[in-house]
């Protein structure tokens, strides 16, 4: 790049520019403002070489920059006015390493910030500072304090040993992951005093000697190895000791059976779908090796539950019988009371005293009472049966009926359609439908049958509404409405198509137009014809 730059305006033999005569140099180093008689600075001044001749320039001090910035064509670390230098500010004044800023520290026990580090710095660094609340508490028992110190020492020793063991494990794991060609350098850098051969001001920045720091270059840990190490094969050792063995014998059937290892059978997975007998699975589970012990408490519990159930049933039956008898007695008392009232009323109406009962009349009365009681029981049973039959609702009566008795399958539903939707269970077990492939592979029709398959259902679709009967003034009579429908020629169903022959003209229709689908061919893809042609070609 230096070779491509233009030549300087002055000739190559011109002397270098002396910055000591510049105004900025006189003002900075005491050379200006006092006239020509003012004493100049006794500090050595290194004139900056002209542009294009700075290959040997290495500015290190502030004077080398000439109160200016860094030289971009000089490829060394430059700090004009100590800007960017560690430990220095922009004015060239050195500061301390700390800079008056206290670093944040935490304690080792709980990770809490040590705020008392503010009072422990400076002149208090070597003193004992009581800054925690525990420092103001008095120590009552010195022996307990000593015991606590011993315990604390034991805890610290155990912690140190544990930490060392964990650190060793972690270092071992990390060393196994790190690359093997990383070399640890323990050599300290060497400082060499260098005196250049040329002592002029144009070389070595005017320095008579220089101290060079020499150290090892840091190696890239990811750099591949430069040399390939080959492992030397191990030398042949001593021959093995001969072992005397008996000659091999053919294994018997028992040996084969003993060496048969059953396959592993899982109780949870069977990915290959093997059929494993239950006895083999139970034997593999090992449950047959354990003796099953059934506790006697199970039998006692079952017996107690059975006895309690029988007692509860007997109690319920007894309670029901007593309740029924009480109702019967109440009914008998009511009937007897009514009979007495009726007898008394008839006697009062006749005006005659009732005859005195005799022995024969008493026996007849007992027989009549028995007959009346039996007749009353039969009447009560008949009433109960009639009440039970009358309580059976319509939904209960239709529950046992088949759906086909109430609806017509395969016909249009022209009714109101209100109420509960009823389905025939026989329709769910057919081979047709969306759940079973919808239709056969050789069928191309969308519907399995015609929409209107019966004439009686279609006749109801063209009936006039019943509004005429309810309000003849608004809608007219039903016959009149039907006549209007019959005379209406809006769609002209009996008119033939234009261009069609006259014989094709259709008459009046009583139902919608039905379109017949194309006849299904037995071989829609003409595979039989193709195979026949192929066979003929082979024979030819």
Swiss-Prot record:
Disulphide linkage map: none
Designated name of the protein? SNW/SKI-interacting protein B
The answer on whether this UniProt entry bears the keyword Nucleus reads yes
Q: According to its UniProt record, where is this protein located?
A: Nucleus
According to the record, the residues making up region (SNW) are: 189-353
Basic and acidic residues: bias regions: 16-29, 83-94, 359-382
Keywords, A to Z? Answer: Nucleus
Q: Which family does it belong to?
A: Belongs to the SNW family.
What transmembrane ranges does the database entry give?
A: none
Q: Which Gene Ontology cellular-component terms appear in the entry?
A: spliceosomal complex
Q: Where is the composition biased (Pro residues)?
A: 236-251
The UniProt entry's GO biological process terms, in alphabetical order, are:
mRNA splicing, via spliceosome
Record's InterPro entries?
SKI-int_prot_SKIP (IPR017862), SKI-int_prot_SKIP_SNW-dom (IPR004015)
| Main subcellular localisation | nucleus
Extract the ranges annotated as region (Disordered).
1-106, 215-273, 351-402, 502-526
UniProt entry tagged with the keyword Cytoplasm: no
Q: Where is the composition biased (Low complexity)?
A: 383-393
Q: What is the lineage of its organism?
A: Eukaryota, Viridiplantae, Streptophyta, Embryophyta, Tracheophyta
What Pfam families does the entry give? Answer: SKIP_SNW
């Amino acid at each position: 790049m230096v070779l491509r730059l233009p030549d300087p305006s002055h000739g190559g033999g011109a002397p270098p520019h002396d910055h000591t005569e510049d105004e900025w140099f006189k003002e900075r180093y005491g050379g200006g403002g006092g006239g020509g008689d003012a004493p100049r600075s006794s500090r050595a001044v290194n004139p900056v070489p002209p542009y294009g001749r700075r290959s040997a320039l290495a500015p290190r001090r502030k004077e080398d920059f000439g109160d200016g910035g860094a030289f971009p064509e000089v490829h060394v670390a430059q700090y004009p006015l100590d800007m960017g230098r560690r430990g220095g500010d922009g004015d060239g004044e050195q500061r301390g390493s700390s800079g008056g800023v206290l670093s944040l520290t935490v304690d080792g026990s709980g990770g809490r910030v040590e705020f008392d580090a503010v009072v422990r710095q400076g002149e208090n660094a070597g003193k004992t500072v009581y800054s925690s609340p525990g420092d103001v508490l008095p120590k009552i028992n010195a022996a307990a304090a000593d015991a606590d110190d011993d315990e604390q020492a034991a805890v610290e020793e155990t912690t140190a040993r544990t930490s060392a063991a964990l650190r060793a494990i972690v270092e071992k794991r990390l060393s196994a992951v790190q690359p093997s060609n990383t070399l640890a350098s323990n050599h300290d850098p060497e400082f060499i005093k260098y005196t250049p051969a040329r002592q002029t001001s144009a070389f070595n920045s005017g320095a008579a000697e220089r101290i060079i720091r020499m150290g090892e270059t840091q190696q890239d840990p990811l750099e591949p190895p430069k040399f390939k190490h080959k492992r030397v094969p191990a030398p042949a050792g001593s021959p093995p000791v001969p072992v005397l063995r008996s000659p091999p014998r053919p294994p018997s059937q028992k040996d084969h059976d003993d060496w048969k290892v059953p396959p592993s059978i899982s109780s949870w997975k069977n990915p290959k779908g093997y059929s494993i007998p239950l006895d083999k699975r139970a034997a593999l589970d090992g449950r047959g090796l354990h003796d099953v012990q059934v506790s006697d408490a199970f039998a006692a519990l079952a017996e107690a539950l059975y006895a309690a159930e029988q007692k509860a049933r007997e109690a319920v039956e007894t309670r029901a019988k007593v309740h029924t008898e009480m109702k019967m007695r109440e009914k008998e008392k009511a009937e007897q009371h009514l009979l007495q009232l009726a007898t008394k009323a008839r006697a009062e109406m006749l005006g005659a005293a009732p005859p005195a009962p005799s022995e024969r009349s008493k026996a007849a009365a007992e027989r009549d009472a028995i007959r009346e009681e039996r007749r009353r029981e039969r009447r009560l049973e008949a009433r109960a049966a009639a009440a039970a039959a009358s309580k059976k609702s319509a939904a209960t009566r239709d529950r046992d009926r088949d759906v086909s008795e109430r609806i017509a399958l395969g016909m249009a539903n022209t009714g109101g359609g209100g109420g509960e939707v009823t389905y025939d269970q026989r329709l769910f077990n057919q081979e047709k439908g969306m759940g079973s492939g919808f239709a056969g592979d050789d069928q191309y029709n969308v519907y399995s049958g015609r929409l209107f398959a019966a004439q009686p259902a279609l006749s109801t679709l063209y009936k006039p509404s019943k509004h005429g009967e309810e309000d003849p003034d608004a809608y007219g009579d039903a016959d009149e409405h039907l006549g209007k429908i019959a005379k209406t020629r809006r769609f002209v169903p009996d008119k033939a198509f234009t261009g069609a022959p006259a014989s094709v003209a259709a008459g009046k229709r009583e139902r919608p137009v039905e379109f017949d689908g194309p006849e299904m061919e037995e071989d829609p893809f003409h595979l039989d014809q193709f195979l026949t042609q192929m066979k003929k070609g082979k024979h030819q």
